[in-house]
């Protein structure tokens, strides 16, 4: 009995000390302290994410330092796996993630329509209106979509600076680029499919340009990492529809990898996140969610993980302001709204895949 009481004292002391250490974020309302205290008592937050663990590492470390006593259980998976896993777990009625964070904006929003908790983050006023859907799904990043190329094997004068220029280059040098252009397999990659939809909306010549890129045979992959690796090695020469955040991070240590920001239009992806209605750790989930959107969390993403910030008040150039100064009106941010769901309707999805297969010769 004495041992049990002693254990209880230790347990309560631990919770109390963690609550004291986990201070109210600057500028937040006083009653947010209740969320902090409850989150510390919950002790854990489970994240389902497409952002790889290495990139998210500094963010996780910063959050756990901000809120001692809350452990982040981070599950890194591709967008299709995340969607299918979450749906299956909901159908089975078992435990699942507290927060979903996905680069596949359309499937993330589809999940949010059925499973997201409505939550007005204290950071809401710092975000662009197009990045928030019904205070349920929030865009968290501002990531241009780029071309990559092998700097050793493609002369600077040949580097394409538009989607049409890319197609013309491959058509004009068909022998050189035969089987050497890579992009997403839109049937295996949720992100790849979503970007193909957005390309088709942004560019009336999309399918014609895609056919030009595919003249010598298009190589398709389901992973950004694989595409960058193959372009860097010379197995492929050009990569199309690559997340600029990953490309910029790799280019810092890979002298073979070049990046081109197209001048005709640059799609901008924003990783979509939401708190789940059935969260087992709802207060810890809110703390994580707000931390990701906060100036501190966004600074970590921008300056340590090389993922551009959705905010405009982050130190350095890796935020909305910095991207706007660099790319101007070419930027086409993808809004977090119902238009993302249009091509998830089975008939429209199949129609687009059929068009893509024809153009890509797949």
Question: What spans do the regions from the language model cover?
Answer:
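Bacterial N-terminal signal peptides that target proteins for export
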Residues: 1-9
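N-terminal signal peptide c-region/cleavage motif recognized by signal peptidases
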Residues: 17-19
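Immediate post-signal peptide segment of exported/extracytoplasmic ligand-binding proteins
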Residues: 22-46, 65, 175-178
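Conserved C-terminal helix/tail region of periplasmic/extracytoplasmic solute-binding proteins
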Residues: 28, 332-362
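Short, hydrophobic alpha-helical packing/hinge segments within bilobed ligand-binding/sensory domains
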Residues: 35, 82-83, 107, 227-228, ...
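Extracytoplasmic ligand-binding site segments that recognize negatively charged/polar headgroups
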Residues: 46-60, 73-87, 95-235
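A ligand-binding cleft/hinge motif common to bilobed small-molecule-binding domains
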Residues: 106-111, 232, 237-256
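Mature extracytoplasmic/periplasmic domains
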Residues: 271, 276-337
């Amino acid at each position: 009995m004495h041992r049990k009481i002693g254990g209880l004292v230790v347990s309560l002391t631990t919770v109390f000390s963690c609550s004291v250490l986990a201070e109210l974020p600057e500028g937040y309302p006083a009653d947010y302290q209740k969320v902090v205290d409850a989150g510390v008592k919950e002790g854990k937050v489970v994240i389902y994410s497409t952002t790889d663990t290495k990139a998210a590492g500094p963010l996780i470390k910063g959050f756990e330092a901000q809120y001692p006593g809350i452990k982040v259980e981070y599950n890194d998976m591709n967008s299709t796996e995340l969607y299918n896993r979450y749906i299956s777990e909901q159908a089975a009625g078992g435990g699942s993630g507290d927060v979903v964070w996905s680069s596949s904006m359309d499937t993330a929003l589809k999940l949010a329509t059925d499973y997201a908790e409505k939550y007005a983050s204290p950071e809401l006023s710092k975000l662009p209106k197009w990045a928030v859907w019904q205070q349920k799904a929030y865009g968290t990043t501002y990531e241009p979509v780029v071309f990559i190329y092998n700097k050793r094997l493609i002369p600077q004068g040949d580097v394409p600076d538009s989607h049409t220029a890319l197609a013309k280059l491959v058509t004009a040098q068909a022998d050189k680029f035969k089987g050497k252009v890579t992009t997403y397999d839109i049937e295996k990659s949720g992100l790849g499919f979503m970007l193909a939809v957005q390309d088709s909306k942004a560019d009336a010549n999309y399918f014609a340009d895609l056919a030009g890129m595919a003249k010598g045979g298009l190589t398709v992959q389901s992973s950004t990492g694989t595409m960058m690796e193959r372009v860097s090695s010379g197995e492929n020469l050009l990569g199309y529809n690559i997340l600029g955040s990953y490309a910029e991070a790799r280019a810092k240590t890979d002298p073979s990898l070049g990046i081109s920001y197209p001048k005709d239009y640059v799609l901008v992806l924003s990783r979509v996140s939401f708190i789940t209605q059935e969260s087992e750790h709802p207060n810890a989930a809110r703390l994580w969610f707000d931390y990701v959107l906060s100036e501190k969390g966004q600074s970590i993403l921008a300056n340590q993980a090389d993922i551009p910030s959705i905010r405009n008040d982050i130190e350095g150039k890796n935020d909305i302001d910095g991207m706007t100064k660099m790319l101007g009106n070419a930027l086409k941010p993808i809004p977090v709204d119902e238009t993302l769901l249009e091509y998830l309707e089975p008939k429209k999805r199949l129609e687009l895949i059929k068009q893509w297969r024809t153009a890509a010769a797949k």
